[in-house]
């Protein structure tokens, strides 16, 4: 194969050899450009567009965040720490229609027992205690037992509120 190619190369004139060499070089350069360089350049341009888009999104989010903070007027979440822990637990449980079976104060903590309660209502009540009154759940033991779906029994709930 190589002998045939060399024989053909010797059989053509010097002018044709230059023409074939220049044409082959152009084809090689074009091949490198379209197969290697062009895809890389396209990917780089696409990444630059993505970065620009993400920077614009970040700037927009920062602007909107500042607007939200300005609308809040610098007011943070207010935690009501008035009243005793027992009073807060009784009042909020009554408001959430949760029937407490027993309360037992233990120093700075409070033990609570609830016979049956909707699990979702229990979570909402505990979240409101934490968010609005700063009450923390130290220990919770919940059992489903033989209750209807969605109902649970709180065997032990230990609550505290930092002073």
Swiss-Prot record:
GO terms for biological process: protein secretion by the type II secretion system. Type II secretion system is composed of four main components: the outer membrane complex, the inner membrane complex, the cytoplasmic secretion ATPase and the periplasm-spanning pseudopilus. Forms homodimers. Interacts with ExeL/GspL. Interacts with ExeE/GspE and ExeF/GspF. Residues 1-19 are cytoplasmic. This is Type II secretion system protein M. Residues 41-163 are periplasmic. The keyword Membrane applies. It is a single-pass membrane protein. GO terms for cellular component: plasma membrane; type II protein secretion system complex. Inner membrane component of the type II secretion system required for the energy-dependent secretion of extracellular factors such as proteases and toxins from the periplasm. Plays a role in the complex assembly and recruits ExeL resulting in a stable complex in the inner membrane. Provides thus a link between the energy-providing ExeE protein in the cytoplasm and the rest of the T2SS machinery. Disulfide bonds: none annotated. It comes from Aeromonas hydrophila.
